[in-house]
Amino acid sequence: MHKEAEMLIGPQLDEKRWGWRLGDGSAAPPFLPQALSFLLLLPLASALQPTPLPFQELRLVGGPSRCRGRLEVMHGGSWGSVCDDDWDVVDANVVCRQLGCGLALPVPRPLAFGQGRGPILLDNVECRGQEAALSECGSRGWGVHNCFHYEDVAVLCDEFLPTQPPTRKMLTSRAPPTTLPNGKSEGSVRLVGGANLCQGRVEILHSGLWGTVCDDDWGLPDAAVVCRQLGCGAAMAATTNAFFGYGTGHILLDNVHCEGGEPRLAACQSLGWGVHNCGHHEDAGALCAGLGPPTLTALPSSATREDWAWQTDPSATGVGPQPSRETALLTTAAWAAGKKSGRLRLVGGPGPCRGRVEVLHAGGWGTVCDDDWDFADARVACREAGCGPALGATGLGHFGYGRGPVLLDNVGCAGTEARLSDCFHLGWGQHNCGHHEDAGALCAGPEELGLQVQQDGSETTRVPTPRPRDGHLRLVNGAHRCEGRVELYLGQRWGTVCDDAWDLRAAGVLCRQLGCGQALAAPGEAHFGPGRGPILLDNVKCRGEESALLLCSHIRWDAHNCDHSEDASVLCQPS
């Protein structure tokens, strides 16, 4: 993972910390939800040229253990502190690894371990993440800084020691599993965050602690082992990108590779306990058939939150491909807008296609609770409102608190329903919510895609689009229009796509979407030069048959751990 040597202004995601920090205190434009506040400008400022400095010693002081405290380094026979300009969890991970203290954790602010004394020796430390020692990272140079001791860096390590060496290995043991006091044994698994015990985020027990599994290389054979270990029948889907929400605690397994016949997940190959390069935004999940009546509708072999959800409907017995009538989402194909039902509206936003979701029932309007509210639900709401495809799902009363009853809760749509009320929910008026949890939707609107809708909302026709609209894609800096850096237009700005998980399948979807034939290559690392502006997508994972890039799995809109040195590109073979 490379980090730019420039200072970023605007919201930025610290790698593996999964939280925003606002560099200039700016607020998001009023027409965008909080989840898209990262679309503020991210101009690149004062170019630093990081230079590694030779030093060997560092320590953490003022904390409860040698693995937690204020960071100090030695230079010229004296200890000094490090300024927190540009400091993030990538740098902290290098320190923790060098000290043999595991992985870095978020540090409470401010001044968790007090202010230092003496010189401030380093500023603008820039690590790439793979360094064995902090001395291999760049900085401004010894004693060059613009800081005070209230900016001293503190580091908090989890003191978790992974299995060494970090190479792919078997986790099997000839010894029988050790049973713990709670009845669970080493290597036990569970599924968390789903609708029942047979679907959810995969968690595994190691040394008495539950932890998650990273989705690198995660697939249906791996999910099959989990389902069988739990007695949950066959695997219906293997999910990625924290489909069932972010876990907490340790990430215990990465690059899991099961043949499918193993009796336990711990018997599959992996990098070893605790060895990974992931964040909880990459938590793996599984959906199993279970022992009761089937509860899933139209699930592919690898489900994505954008395309799929589940219903507790005993009549849903089939498993098959997603209906394709509305998969042409953006850019090259017109959207077939559904007829407005008159029973759903979006209010509180900048227009009729962005706002708080309200539904009509028994002659009165009410709101929808954000429990389980996600992109698939927003897709149905946008369709029912006659507003084209969804761009995002919001919660926590983002578009203001509603009035009147909360009419729907725990909505679970597959994404293909004509009306929100057709989706699974707890029942009219059944909820445990307040209006601070009102759900919302951000829709492109027919006008955003260059479409013209008849007044009854039932038909659409393609019309020219003189300027880019939200969701449009382009390839930049190539020799022709079918090769270049991938850029997406959203929130009145063009932004890039990170190359994490970017592969030929994703490139194939994009080439096909742009009418550019087959994909020849999917280079990363800013092959066509680094872009500017926000990084809009990360961890894009396509199955290959999707008709639009945004139908592929990806991390939520407001999250990435990349910089523009990792911009994704494609080379297509025009047909």
UniProtKB/Swiss-Prot annotation:
Signal peptide positions on this chain: 1-47
SMART domains linked to this entry: SR (SM00202)
SRCR domain location: 58-158, 189-289, 344-444, 473-573
Localization in the cell: Secreted
One of the Pfam families matching this protein, by short name: SRCR
Disulphide-bonded residues: 83-147, 96-157, 127-137, 214-278, 227-288, 258-268, 369-433, 382-443, 413-423, 498-562, 511-572, 542-552
Keyword Secreted (UniProt): yes
Top-level taxonomic group: Eukaryota
Keyword presence, ATP-binding: no
This protein's UniProt keywords: Disulfide bond, Repeat, Secreted, Signal
Induction, as annotated: Not induced by a combination of IL1A/interleukin-1 alpha, IL6/interleukin-6 and dexamethasone.
GO cellular component, one term: extracellular region
InterPro entries: SRCR, SRCR-like_dom_sf
Protein name: Scavenger receptor cysteine-rich domain-containing group B protein
Taxonomic lineage: Eukaryota, Metazoa, Chordata, Craniata, Vertebrata
Gene that encodes it: SSC4D
